[in-house]
Amino acid sequence: AALDYWGGKNVITCGMYRNAEDRDKIRTLTKNDVTFSFLGFTDHTNGLRIAEDSELEVVYTSDEAEIQKEITEASKISDMVVVSVHWGTENSHTINDAQRALAQKMCDWGANIIIGTHPHVIQGVEELTAADGRKTLVAYSLGNFISAQDVNSRMIGGMLDFDIRKSYEKNTVTYENVKFIPVVTHYDYSFSNIRIYPFSDYTKELASKHGVNAKSPFSYDFIVQTLKDNISDKYLDLN
């Protein structure tokens, strides 16, 4: 159903495929003479399994040979390889060893940007160096962009913002000016009127009235501290 819905929109999807042939078609987008490839992998599917007689395809993080193949192929046809990975420990700000190990491997294989999902809470942003000296930007978890959950830390998410620069003289494409822009999911009593605020537009008054306070204490200062505890000042943009 999800593939049918998004298939009718002007949206690039990756991570779930109709069959093996569809999986092998790397999704690309070219803008301003820069070609991006988009790949998606997952540690698990939240207890759901693909039926044995289904042709649907998902690439799991345990299948490192397939991941390496896809990143390598994507590198050949694009300037920037963007990888989305569903991984990490749920509800934990701590980046686990498996995340770090796979991130470094994907960096070495040719990924340029790695964006993590799944933990529901934010995790750190850092830059890795590949064996050949290339740099790879990794945001281990952007947290929840929007949710109807009832834990304070799950109300805080982020957007990753950066510029892409192409040098015709050096024949290189790089990212620069990386920013982690925080967002806050806000709802009223009993999960009503859910909306999203950029942190720059959020206020102490809104935080004091957040419906999550019924289950989990929430405040403006809590948001700031959570962000500063997990996102390097090098990337954190609170303005």
Predicted regions and their residues:
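Acidic, metal/ion-coordinating pockets
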Residues: 1-239
